[in-house]
Structure formats: structure tokens, C-alpha cells
Amino acid sequence: MDRCKHVGRLRLAQDHSILNPQKWCCLECATTESVWACLKCSHVACGRYIEDHALKHFEETGHPLAMEVRDLYVFCYLCKDYVLNDNPEGDLKLLRSSLLAVRGQKQDTPVRRGRTLRSMASGEDVVLPQRAPQGQPQMLTALWYRRQRLLARTLRLWFEKSSRGQAKLEQRRQEEALERKKEEARRRRREVKRRLLEELASTPPRKSARLLLHTPRDAGPAASRPAALPTSRRVPAATLKLRRQPAMAPGVTGLRNLGNTCYMNSILQVLSHLQKFRECFLNLDPSKTEHLFPKATNGKTQLSGKPTNSSATELSLRNDRAEACEREGFCWNGRASISRSLELIQNKEPSSKHISLCRELHTLFRVMWSGKWALVSPFAMLHSVWSLIPAFRGYDQQDAQEFLCELLHKVQQELESEGTTRRILIPFSQRKLTKQVLKVVNTIFHGQLLSQVTCISCNYKSNTIEPFWDLSLEFPERYHCIEKGFVPLNQTECLLTEMLAKFTETEALEGRIYACDQCNSKRRKSNPKPLVLSEARKQLMIYRLPQVLRLHLKRFRWSGRNHREKIGVHVVFDQVLTMEPYCCRDMLSSLDKETFAYDLSAVVMHHGKGFGSGHYTAYCYNTEGGFWVHCNDSKLNVCSVEEVCKTQAYILFYTQRTVQGNARISETHLQAQVQSSNNDEGRPQTFS
């Protein structure tokens, strides 16, 4: 066996009986043939071809390694094979050299049948008369051992000269070199960790550093106040060199959980990884128009006409502090130092009384995509959410889907009010940029549905265009059955395409509740007769595709009167989604096939079994680095797309591969198509 893991734990005693040739006999049967010495204790026993006392010793004590005292073979009873490797200390090689040296010494002690005879009285060896045949077996044994060693040496040299032997030697050298590199890397990591621990031990804790940073300048003389962060004069150059680490990938920034805020962190991570949404807020500069954003008043928003520059000054001051820290070498990947530095950028509360979600998104996205920070605490963002969206105030667990809808609605309201109320006070460049941001917010998730109702009496079709910002998909009926004996939900799978097909399938309206325009066209308005009601069918189809398709899987169902439970079935979804089967037929002929292709961009996952509890995480695709990231609050891990597709998705985000201006057909063309279809059918048909 080339590699035995039990040899690494070998610890041989210095007074072992194997080093004394007079003890090379079995302690049970006293034979000297095929003698094996235990490498864990001083026990010596015979092999399996004699009485198998060595195996019995292993079964009793559990000592796996034994060495043949004459052939110097090492056998492992646990691996059931001969051992060819050695431990890092080289104990087996040293032991073999010692045994060869001991064997080479001259032994004058007489033996009988391989046993040394000693006197019980004097303790001296009793010399017995040796017979002529007595020396012949010893000579033959010595000659056999010599031939064995010569043959083994010849075979070893021949094997080393062969191609297979050369390859094996090269592989062994590479493994040894790799092991040396790993050991060197481990040694360097231990040294870096030791130096970091020494440095952190001499640095003030995070809380005191934050309080010192927020101390007013006029609170006391500069000499009497201790510095919040070590300056370049006090820190050695070697330590500064150690702190400066390579820049991180943009977007790989965790968000600290501030108390059941995982729903907010997961949604913010998803929005920041949607490239078009992120770029429009990064280009927006709210500091120039901050006085025009609404301010909070008891949970409601109102406009302020008095301009103020406090927030702009604070924002620039925070950025200057962050850049100063970076120049001094304090932007390293240490957990404690990161927390202290990030307090410079994200305060616990907005310094200005004018609360703006757009400003907080702009600031937060800048930090997350700067490539300098591994963790940020979104205090200001949470405070703004509490002020502008009172339903999410407090530390209760909230629904991520509801938070996403409310957040986008408030951002849209804020941009619309900012662009219309104080239009003349906004610079033209910022006015144009604000319009672009509002356009992106309004259109990135916006799509349109075609609601088509068909009268069963006359087969007349009536079309209505309805907007949508996400598609809430229900599970098939078999997952809503909670009767006894039903197959458990966690043992089955559901296809995303099946849920989309259920969303766009034709459903019959219950009873005669539809007032058809065609059936009531001959009836006069002044006619006192009631409207003619008929049965009808309804179908929803996608009329206009959005740039980012949000699919909300309705996992929570009502079980009883006041209890909601979760449908824990796995939904199978692919990295590429084709929306062509779910669009109206007139739309298919007017658009390119590539327009219907969507690529998976993000997944929000709910961990847990019930509504109002559990935990939210997000899987996001980083467009800058081209990899997937699992965002679990402050912990971020790179993962594969196969890992993402195995998650229990709650909200899916798909980005349109090709965006075309002609993403929908005109309503005039649609009405013409429907009118032509109705005219071609001739007389009304009745369906049973």
C-alpha cells in the first residue's frame, strides 16, 4: 500500500524490544520464524503462517502496525496490506537502519532451536556444545536473507530505471513539493493571524472607535482625545503593508442583519445586482436636489420648499473620510476594522431631516459596488424604510415580496413628486437624469397582460389590456390538497413551466355572469328589459414583455381560518426561460424569437416552514465578475448555477436577453385582428 494513514500516528518507544535481537521470538510459542514486532508496544509474536499470535495481539489491543524483524516488512492490519510509505519523521527508515546495524553485529550467544539459553542462577549464558548440523540452518538462513536483499535491490534499481518507475518517482516528488508548499502556506497564514491578533489586541473596540469618530471637533483639545483609528505615524510600515489587501470584486459586499432584516437585505442585494436598475441609481446624484425630495412627517411624506445643503455636505464629508481611511491603508479585510470603517459611510440615522429612499439607494449601491468593503450596516436605509413605510417598522419578520412592491412604489412616488413639484429649481442635467431614472423604475418591471373574455353564446371575444409588475404563480391543485393519505409535498416536484401554463390557461367563469356586447348590441339603452347574461371563458396572455420578469411563487396557503402554511415542494426552473408559449398569438408573429428568451438573474429563497417566520437569502448573478453569489446577510459565498437551480425559490428574476422597441403590438392592430376573427366566424355558435 503506497499511502497508509496510520503510519503518520506512529510513535515508537526508544526501549522497544525490537532493538534487542535476544527478544526476537514469539512471546506465546517462543518460535523465531516469521516473528513480527508491534510498533505500538513491546510485544513480539509470530505471523499467520505459524500460530498467528500477532493477529490475536491486534484483535486484543487494536495496534495495527507490525514489522517483520528479519525481512523488515511493515504490515497494517487495518488496511490489510503491506506499508510502503513512512511518517514525516522517517521513523521506519531509521528503525530499518538500526536493525540492519544490529543484525550485522557478531553474536556469540549459543541458541537451541532459535532460543538463547541462559542460566537461572548466575544470569550468565550457559554454553552448550554445538553440533555440526546446528550451524547449517543459520548459514542457510543468512544466505537466503542476503539473496533476498540483493534481489530486492536489483528489482528496485530496475524499477527506478523503467518509465513507470520514473513516473512514480516524479509523482512522488511533485506530491512532496506540493506538501511543502501547503505547509509553507499554512505557516504564513499562522504568522499573519498571529500578527493580526496582536494588532487587534492593541486597537480600541468598535463601539468606542465609532463614538470617538462622531465626537465634535470643539469638544476638547486634539491632544487630549485619543485617536479613533491608528495613524500612519503610530503604525509601523510593516503593519501597513500587511493591511493592504487586493481589492475585492465589486458587488461582493454583505449586509449586516439589524434584527430580522433578512427580507430587506435579500431584496437590496437583488436590486443592486440588476445591472440597469443599479446603474441608473449610481448615476443619480441626490445631493444636488436633496431639498426637493420628500421628508417624513409621522409616516407621511410632504414636500419641503426650503433648500438645505446639510445632507450634501455630510455625504461629501463621509466620502472624504472613507477615502482618507483608504489612503492611510485602513481598508483591509479584517472583520473588526471593516465594521469601524463602514460607520463612516452608513450612519445609524440619516443626518438630514429630509428622508429619501433614492438617496439611500444611491449611497448604498456606491458602497456595495466600490470593491472596497466586505460588509456594511444599512442603518440609514432601515431608518428610511421605517419612516416612509410604517408597515415595516419594528423588528418583526416581514414578507420579501411585499417589501419589494412597497419599496418600488415609494421610490416611484418620490421620483414623480420630485420631478413635477419643483421642476424650475432643478438643474437641467439633473432633471434629465431624474427622468431617466423614473423611466427605468417605471419600465424595468412593467409588462402588460391581455385579458380575453370569450362569450360562449356567440363566441365574441372582448380584449382588455392590464398592466403588471410581477406574475404571481399558483401551484397546481394537487399541492393544495391536505387530505389524509396524500403524498407529502416535499417528495414531489413542480415545473415552473407548468405554473406558467396554469396562469395562462383558459378558465370558465362560474354561471351566467357575463354581459356580452355582441349579444346586447340590438337591445336599446332605453329598453327596460334586463341585460342578457351568458356564460363565458377567460384567458390571460402576455401582451407586452418586461425587461426584468419577476415570478412570485405563491408558496403560502391558508390552512384553517387563521393559519397559513408553506408549500415546501421544489420548483424546477432553468437558467434560460422561453416565454413564447405564454404570449398572445398576434405577438408571436411581430417579434424576433430572441426577444422571448430570458436569462436567470436572481433568486430569493425562503428558509423555514411557516408564514411570518424563517429566513430569507438571495442568489444573485454578478455581471461584473460573471459568477453567482449566495447572499446570506453578512455572509457571501460564490456558488455554481447548478447550486442555484436546486434551491427552493420564492421569487425568481429573469432578465430579457434582447430588448426590442417593438415589444408589443399596437392596440389598433389587435382590435383589427379580433374583429376579423369575429367576422370570420359568421353566425353565433352555441357551445355546450
Swiss-Prot record:
Family recorded in the similarity comment: Belongs to the peptidase C19 family.
Zn finger intervals (UBP-type): 2-99
Binding residue positions for Zn(2+) 3: 38, 41, 57, 63
Organism: Homo sapiens (Human)
Biased composition (Basic and acidic residues): 169-186
Pfam families: UCH (PF00443), zf-UBP (PF02148)
Record's catalysed reaction(s): Thiol-dependent hydrolysis of ester, thioester, amide, peptide and isopeptide bonds formed by the C-terminal Gly of ubiquitin (a 76-residue protein attached to proteins as an intracellular targeting signal)
Subunit record text: Component of a complex with RUVBL1 and PSMC5. Interacts with centrins CETN1, CETN2 and CETN3.
EC number from the UniProt entry: 3.4.19.12
GO biological process: mRNA splicing, via spliceosome; negative regulation of phosphatidylinositol 3-kinase/protein kinase B signal transduction; protein deubiquitination; proteolysis
UniProt-annotated binding residues for Zn(2+) 2: 26, 29, 46, 53
InterPro entries named among the record's database cross-references: Papain-like_cys_pep_sf, Peptidase_C19_UCH, Ub_carboxyl-term_hydrolase, USP_CS, USP_dom, Znf_RING/FYVE/PHD, Znf_UBP
Keyword Hydrolase: yes
Free-text function comment from the UniProt entry: Deubiquitinase that plays a role in several cellular processes including transcriptional regulation, cell cycle progression or innate immunity. Specifically deubiquitinates histone H2B at 'Lys-120' (H2BK120Ub), a specific tag for epigenetic transcriptional activation and acts as a regulator of mRNA splicing. Antagonizes DNA double-strand break-induced ubiquitination of H2AX thereby participating in the maintenance of genome integrity.
Keyword Hydrolase: yes
Polar residues composition bias: residue spans: 298-315
Protein name per Swiss-Prot or TrEMBL: Ubiquitin carboxyl-terminal hydrolase 49
Subcellular location: Nucleus; Cytoplasm
Catalytic residues in the record: 262, 615
